[in-house]
Amino acid sequence: MDLPGGHLAVVLFLFVLVSMSTENNIIRWCTVSDAEDQKCLDLAGNATARNLRGQLVCVRGQSPTDCMKQIKNGTADASTMYADEIYTAGFCYGLDVAVGESYNGVDGINYYVVALARTSSSDLSLLEMHERSSCHPGMRTTVGWTVPIGFLVNTSQISVDVQCNFPHAVGDFFGYSCVPGVKDPEHDPKGNNPRNLCEACIGDENDRHICANNPRERHFGEAGALRCVAENLGDVAFVKHTTVFDNMQGKNQESWALDLELEDLKLLCPDGSEANLFQHESCHLAVVPTNAVVVRLEDKCRVYKFLERVQNAFGNTTEGFSLFSSVNYGQPDVLFSDSTKKLLRVMGTYTSWLGPSYTTILRAFECEGLC
């Protein structure tokens, strides 16, 4: 049947509107594992069954960086990322965040990075750490490397050469340390990272696996870094503010932990002062934010509104699909952290979510070529 020109124009206009509306309601979520794929598909199916407005489509990425590229290029719309990944997404790819996880339902604070020392060490200052000994949970970890080394760079205690060789700068600065993994091929492909960065490590009970990037090195991880200081093998340990409390009062049955008292330890503050263990909110190296959902700037509102509907439907469920539970997926923290109480809308930029202390820390590493 022939349509008059005016009627045909109206039909075409309506077709375009419907097509644009349908496309605008589709959220393409970039996943990086089989577990994320499955939970994304389950979320999509449950959202459809509940007649939630918007359609979730799952898109596979090879890595968080690949997801950043896909979101920038428009082949994906959203993906949950860690704090350091959020910085890269914003700094290198011009992306932003729509919502962030909240573990207390109020703010987006994940944890504080603190510097622990023995109370008996009366002459210690974070502004005078040259030739001191240090204990780190692991190489290239946020708590054990990025935050403390970034702090030392930003306070002009460490200077990095034109090759941007952080391990050599750190080795030259500290007298000796335990940085598990610093000699692993992944972090030391040429085999020339300073050996003194392993001298406070102790390996296993048979003196093997010294400086290994796994629990066979007894000073590995946050509990290991705490042990390193507790046993007087290091002057300072860089850990989360919860580490001490997670390993005391019988929670850790190893002999070194059972012998430790709260009064034995103190916090070292960035201004050179000291504080007790309960004053982490005012005495810390950085506040590390929770994970957030990375999007294109123009999609902040659209993705937020979709996730708000999803959260209202599946955020607090005790039966059936649960947005903040990973019990059916073989590993924790799939798509979202299991400890998430609520998703918070991010009105500002990605740097406002990351916060000034953490953003400043990350800028110290820009010479490594994030992009």
Swiss-Prot record:
Domain named Transferrin-like: which ranges?
Answer: 27-367
For this protein, the record's InterPro entries field holds: Transferrin-like_dom
Annotated signal sequence is 1-21
Mind telling me which GO cellular component terms the entry cites?
early endosome; extracellular space; plasma membrane; recycling endosome
Q: Which Gene3D superfamilies match?
A: Periplasmic binding protein-like II
Annotated compartments: Secreted
**Record has Secreted as a keyword:** yes
Instruction: Tell me which UniProt keywords the record has, alphabetically.
Output: Secreted, Signal
What is this protein's function per UniProt? Required for normal otolith growth and deposition of otolin-1 in the otolith.
Listed PANTHER family = OTOLITH MATRIX PROTEIN 1 (PTHR11485:SF49), TRANSFERRIN (PTHR11485)
Put simply, this protein is called Otolith matrix protein 1
Origin species, per record, is Danio rerio
UniProt gene name: otomp
